[in-house]
């Protein structure tokens, strides 16, 4: 039910300002004078401001009232105009390349607070960002105050450092179950020699408003390869087939394409029935992993096979 919150500051020369809509508190926002009554799910940002001192750190809290979830809960906070403004809002205008500062608060199904992190957020995906419920890619950066999210997000992976995570909307399965992609990847776990992105469903609140189920996913990046395969992130080639305005292209994410081009040219120029040729290819690539990839693509009727394909190797 409703309750009140009391705020205090240690100096008589400072005052507390607060907001309840996700915006940054400042001298032009609400001045705290009496306890704040909380009657429904609310996000509170508060900071102290004095005449001869630097403004205090912004304190963030999310209060859930009569909200029940059996899933982990994400509270995603951002300046409202960075989301909804008709000129600059990334949600309003479907701006994919614009990155906005956000605060993330994570709560376990038992409502325990897991972590709070300041980060950047962009709309993610190739086409799925056009859905009414959009995916977010989260980027930790030094300028936001931290390089990693230090928390174990996934039960089936003993990893507790993330520089990128994705709050996915279900992708091509958005209108249906939201779980086809993570369910398919769960079949790979422990069974095939393929990298896969871990998955955990969550209930996401955007500036205090319930925003539906979003799947927490890993993201393929240099830190992913370090944590999952214990390889030097500065010494890999990482390539991705993705769609661009000029069509589907193979792009270099990390390293170079030299080794890949050498291998492809060798394959096109030689007879794979020759055992010596095949043995050479096995030295250059993990053939079993590639077979597993093809098996899953066909068996699970992958509808995004024209893109969303990534290769990597440790140099």
Model regions: which residues?
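Short consensus segments that form the blades of beta-propeller domains
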Residues: 91-96, 128-129, 301
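Zinc-dependent metallopeptidase catalytic helix centered on the HExxH motif
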Residues: 207, 296-315
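Extracellular structured ligand-interaction cores
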Residues: 2, 33, 41-43, 60, ...
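ATP-dependent phospho-/nucleotidyl transfer catalytic cores
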Residues: 151-158, 162-177, 209, 215-302
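Short, compositionally stereotyped local motifs that mark structural "simplifiers"
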Residues: 1-121, 142, 170
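Reverse-transcriptase-like RNA-dependent polymerase core
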Residues: 136-158
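Zn2+-dependent metallopeptidase catalytic core
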Residues: 102-111, 179-194
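Short, well-structured beta-strand/strand-turn elements
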Residues: 190-205
């Amino acid at each position: 039910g409703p309750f009140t919150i009391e705020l205090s500051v240690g100096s008589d020369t400072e005052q507390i300002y607060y907001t309840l809509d996700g915006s940054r508190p400042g001298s032009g926002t609400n001045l705290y004078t009496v306890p704040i009554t909380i009657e429904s799910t609310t996000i509170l940002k508060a900071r102290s401001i004095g005449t001869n001192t630097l403004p205090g750190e912004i304190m963030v809290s999310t209060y859930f009232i009569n909200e029940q979830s059996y899933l982990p809960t994400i509270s995603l906070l951002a300046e409202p105009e960075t989301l909804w403004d008709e000129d600059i809002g990334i949600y309003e205008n479907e701006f994919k390349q614009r990155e906005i500062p956000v605060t993330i608060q994570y709560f376990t199904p038992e409502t325990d607070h897991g972590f709070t992190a300041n980060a950047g957020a962009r709309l993610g995906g190739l086409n799925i960002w056009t859905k009414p419920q959009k995916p977010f890619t989260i980027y930790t950066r030094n300028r936001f105050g931290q390089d990693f999210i230090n928390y174990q997000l996934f039960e089936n992976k003993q990893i507790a450092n993330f520089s990128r995570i994705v709050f996915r909307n279900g992708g091509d399965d958005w209108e249906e179950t939201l779980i086809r992609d993570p369910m398919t990847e769960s079949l790979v776990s422990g069974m095939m020699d393929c990298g896969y992105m871990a998955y955990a469903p969550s209930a996401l609140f955007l500036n205090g408003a319930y925003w539906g189920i979003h799947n927490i996913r890993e993201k393929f990046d240099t830190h992913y390869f370090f944590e999952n395969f214990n390889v030097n992130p500065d010494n890999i080639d990482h390539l991705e087939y993705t769609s661009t305005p000029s069509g589907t292209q193979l792009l270099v994410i990390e390293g170079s394409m030299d080794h890949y081009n050498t291998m492809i040219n060798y394959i096109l120029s030689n007879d794979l029935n020759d055992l010596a040729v095949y043995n050479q290819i096995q030295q250059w690539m993990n053939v079993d992993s590639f077979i597993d990839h093809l098996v899953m693509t066909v068996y699970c009727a992958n509808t995004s096979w024209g893109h969303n394909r990534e290769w990597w190797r440790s140099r």
